[in-house]
Swiss-Prot record:
GO terms under cellular component: plasma membrane
Biased composition (Acidic residues): 253-262
Biased composition (Basic and acidic residues): 66-88, 477-491
Organismal lineage: Eukaryota, Fungi, Dikarya, Ascomycota, Saccharomycotina
Protein name per UniProt: Eisosome protein SEG1
Family as reported in the entry's similarity comment: Belongs to the SEG1 family.
Membrane topology note: Peripheral membrane protein
Subcellular location(s) per record: Cell membrane
Compositional bias ranges of the Basic residues kind: 399-411, 588-600, 645-656
Amino acid sequence: MLRKQTPGRARPADVEAVAAVSALGKVMNQDGTALDHSKVRKRESMLPTRGRSGRGGVRRASAESAGRRTRSEDGKAARSARERHMEDEFNAFGGRATAGVAKEVPARGGADDGPVMTTKYVPSPRGLVKVTVPVSAGSSAHSSLRKSASIHTGMNMRHGSGSRRASMTSAGSDAARRQAKSTAESSSARTRSNKPKPRPSGDSHSPSPTTRAPVTPRRTTVKDLVAPPLPEEPEDSVSTSGKGESIVPLNEKEEEQDEQPFDSEANARSSPKTPKQGGHVPALEVSQHGFQTPVPDGPTMAEYLQSADPILSAGATQRQRELEEAEAASTTPDGDRLKIGKSPSPMKSAMKNSPSAGTSKYNRPPLDTSSAADGAYLSLTTAENTRLNAQLSDDKMRKSPTLRQPKRRVSVHSPKTPSAASADRSSKVLRQFSLSKPQGRTLAMNKNNSGEKQAQSPTSPKSNQKKVDPSVLYPREPPKKKSSFERERPQHKNLGFKNLSLRSEASNEFMYQGTLEGEIHQSPGQHVGHETPKKALLSVTAEGWKSRFSDSDSENDSPPFSSNASGSTQPSSHRDSSLAHHGGFGLFKHKDHHGHKPKHSLGASLASAKPHEPQKARLAPTSNRGSNTLSAERPLKNHNSFSGKLKKLFGKKHAT
């Protein structure tokens, strides 16, 4: 049901619309000016039966079809009333016969007043121009026929009347061709004259649309170029008779323009204030009138344009004034000319400073060039220019013209040097030294290139580095540390604690080297000096100091001190005893007042064990006795200073 209702509701609107349009077309007469409303109503009354027969209304006698018919009839009545209103308004403006480009306007006074006139819109350089042209009865019939054919074209295609459509379109095309010819002639005449024709006194009440006006000349211009000229008809003669007054002077003016093409163009440019009006444009007449009285032996075109244009005339007067000044300058005496030629600044040319240098060269008479004064002037200016060019070519002048100032300062101070007092000699030497530096710089800049300057800059720090000893600048690198928990140690060092020693290797090697140097470089008469550290150590142990490494459980270690007096000659026993009892380092601090840092204990033990060695003996061994005797006095001072540092750190005096 739904599928059948949807197309059934859409069909009646299309069929009824087509039927209404066809009824309106058949009711209209040929001119399309009036409608017989009685015929329209009869046609509308016939439309429902035609619509019902078209869609099979006999078989559908249900309530839905009856309701659909009532709705369609109501809509059709409203639509017909709307269409009647639109047709009445359309006929009030002239109907379908006057809807094209050409529009027939009936004469007001009747048929006896004159021929039927028609208004046309013709394109011109200034836009569309409205023209009234007389039209014969045949052309009006053709135009009305063409309009009716354009109206009924859609209808004939639906009803299948192809032969009638072809005949009507052919007749309409003939009428269009004739009308196009007349419009093309009028448009070409207007483009040549560049002025519109005078409008007639009678105004038309029915305006025509301007949308179709540009379409007609486009089609006609192409046909005019291709088709041969057709023989003139009586209506064309009538139309040309109306145009006769404007065409005849046009040809005469064209001939005059061909005779003088350049003058008219120049005059058109030189007279910008040409009046532009819609009806009459007298531009060509004014231009021709201006050239009717030419001057036979007058100025040229350029001079004429200069006189016409105020800007060019002002420039010409200024140029004439400059020429007069140049002539006046060329007649000045030679003495004044030499004064003018002198240049205040050395960087400019002497020829450029004189105002008459450029103009007198061309405006000077030929007899004046052979005078002796001019030759002397030229020679002087040439010599001046040569001298200036030589200064510019100098490298010192081009690169750094301000570097000559220090030399002038030296020359100013030089006569004062012999008369200066002795108190000012030091300041004078400093001043001369400061002045000699820029002089050396100027010589280096003039002699050396930029590459040599860069080569000199890195050489200066190298010479300074050679003088300074690198051992002073950088400290000695300590030896590589080994793990203190190594079980296998080298036997040649003979360290006191071989099993898991917590002592650093660097301190052991340092102490070992110091003892070896002291024993090797000592003479045999100095054995008493070796026993002094043992006595010091015995005094320390007598006071109650004990090493935490000398334990009863240690089996490998030797007793702290042997009763042998010859222990001083054995470096191994002396070294073991000194390391075991006095040079120990611990991870844990003693809580008693005797415990102190390993650094200070090491320094104190070294200072007390070797009083005969200076601190410098650790780096370089001493070979002579004089140095040993002198160094024996120094450790006391070092010991006192070290104990003072301990007092400051701990606030207690340690017995050493």
